[in-house]
């Protein structure tokens, strides 16, 4: 092992990228705060038996360790389950919706050949205690306004509904075991495999057509009427109606140009129970964020409540934005012992104006010309007199 190597999947964030990332994060959280979401933090370490089990992240992707008492801990793999834990135990005591936001790193072990980060930042919100379609529309509208404030102009939010898939698969296939195979094809977006498997099933031609029609249910509001024609149950009809209401509400927000329906969507997050969505941007091969309704998760913490939310991956958002990493505008004051006091006062005055200023003793510099190249302005306090140079 080389001394400069990092653990698999871990990455350094150097100063210029750090500043760019900070600006993007701030542009997201600014909008979320304006919508009344209050930000919070949770521990990086959680108990495996609570947050680890409830996180919906595959067990092999969890970073596990033992504490001194022999209890299994995990590095948090997402933020939804930790916030659900806090909301169930401390926050959601009153009978009114709770709006919280977060910006935090999460940890997921990756296969060595995958090349994906094992630690990445998520910025998002959770709306807890409101089971209405208005709440679903709010979080989708909020993610749209937040992304636009970050400077992203070309993106689309694909919206699905767990209830439509559940209803169709139960009606046609009869049990979850048979449905699981089709869900897997949809999750992997292996539509050829999905079609071939449907054709191989011992079903009537009508039922096969219903399953195959699911792949065509993508587009605008007209998709809902087509969806209604392939589901018979009350649960399925209700899910279609929810999507119609959601579309109408997002129209009131002025957001319908940024959304589309994809009723064959299956998420890797198993706790979603209703509306779910993924955010896609140009030139990025994976969703830059996702969200949805998870009405059963808080019940697992003995505090049943409806909830919905989303998380944006800042690393993928940066990939979509492709912002130029600009050198920070920092000034430097180079001083000698004789004028140290004057140099300190000058630097303090500049900082009060909002400027970033480095104080550097001349005695600590090896190559003064090389050092000053990285600063915007250079001011000297050396010997008996002061002189300035602007670079």
From Swiss-Prot:
Main localization, broad class: cytoplasm
Pfam family of the protein (one): HisZ-like
InterPro entries assigned: aa-tRNA-synth_II, aa-tRNA-synth_II/BPL/LPL, HisRS-like_core, HisRS/HisZ, HisZ, HisZ-C
GO cellular component assignments: cytoplasm
Pathway(s) it belongs to: Amino-acid biosynthesis; L-histidine biosynthesis; L-histidine from 5-phospho-alpha-D-ribose 1-diphosphate: step 1/9
Further information: This function is generally fulfilled by the C-terminal part of HisG, which is missing in some bacteria such as this one.
Quaternary data: Heteromultimer composed of HisG and HisZ subunits.
Family: Belongs to the class-II aminoacyl-tRNA synthetase family. HisZ subfamily.
Listed name of the protein: ATP phosphoribosyltransferase regulatory subunit
Source organism of this protein record: Bacillus licheniformis (strain ATCC 14580 / DSM 13 / JCM 2505 / CCUG 7422 / NBRC 12200 / NCIMB 9375 / NCTC 10341 / NRRL NRS-1264 / Gibson 46)
């Amino acid at each position: 092992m080389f001394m400069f190597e990092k653990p698999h999947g871990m990455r350094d964030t150097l100063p210029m990228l750090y500043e760019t990332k900070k600006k993007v994060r701030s542009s997201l959280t600014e909008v979320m705060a304006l919508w009344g979401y209050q930000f919070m933090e949770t521990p990086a370490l959680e108990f495996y038996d609570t947050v680890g089990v409830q996180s919906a992240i595959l067990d092999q992707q969890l970073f596990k360790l033992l504490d001194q008492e022999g209890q299994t801990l995990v590095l948090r793999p997402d933020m939804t389950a930790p916030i659900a834990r806090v909301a169930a135990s401390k926050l959601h005591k009153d009978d009114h919706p709770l709006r919280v936001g977060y910006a935090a790193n999460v940890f997921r072990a990756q296969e060595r050949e995958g090349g994906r980060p094992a630690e990445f930042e998520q910025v998002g919100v959770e709306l807890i205690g409101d089971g209405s379609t208005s709440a679903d529309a709010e979080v989708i509208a909020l993610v749209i306004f937040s992304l636009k404030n970050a400077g992203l102009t070309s993106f689309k939010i694909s919206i699905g509904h767990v209830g439509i898939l559940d209803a169709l698969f139960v009606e046609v296939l009869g049990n979850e075991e048979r449905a699981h195979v089709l869900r897997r094809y949809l999750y992997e977006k292996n539509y050829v495999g999905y079609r071939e498997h449907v054709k191989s099933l011992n079903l009537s031609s009508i039922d096969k057509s219903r399953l195959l029609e699911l792949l065509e249910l993508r587009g605008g509001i007209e998709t809902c009427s087509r969806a209604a024609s392939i589901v018979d149950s009350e649960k399925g009809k209700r899910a279609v109606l929810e999507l119609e209401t959601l579309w109408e509400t997002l129209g009131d927000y002025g957001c319908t140009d940024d959304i589309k329906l994809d009723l064959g969507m299956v998420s890797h997050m198993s706790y979603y129970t209703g509306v779910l969505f993924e955010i896609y941007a140009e030139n990025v091969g994976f969703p830059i964020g996702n969200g949805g309704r998870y009405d059963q998760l808080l019940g697992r913490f003995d505090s049943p409540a409806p909830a919905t939310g989303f998380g944006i991956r800042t690393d993928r958002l940066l990939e979509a934005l492709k912002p130029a990493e600009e050198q920070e505008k920092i000034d430097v004051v180079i001083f000698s012992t004789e004028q140290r006091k004057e140099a300190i006062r000058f630097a303090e005055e500049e900082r009060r104006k909002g400027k970033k200023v480095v104080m550097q003793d001349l005695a600590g510099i090896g190559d003064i010309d090389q050092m000053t190249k990285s600063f915007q302005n250079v001011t000297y306090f050396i010997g008996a007199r002061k002189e300035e140079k602007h670079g």
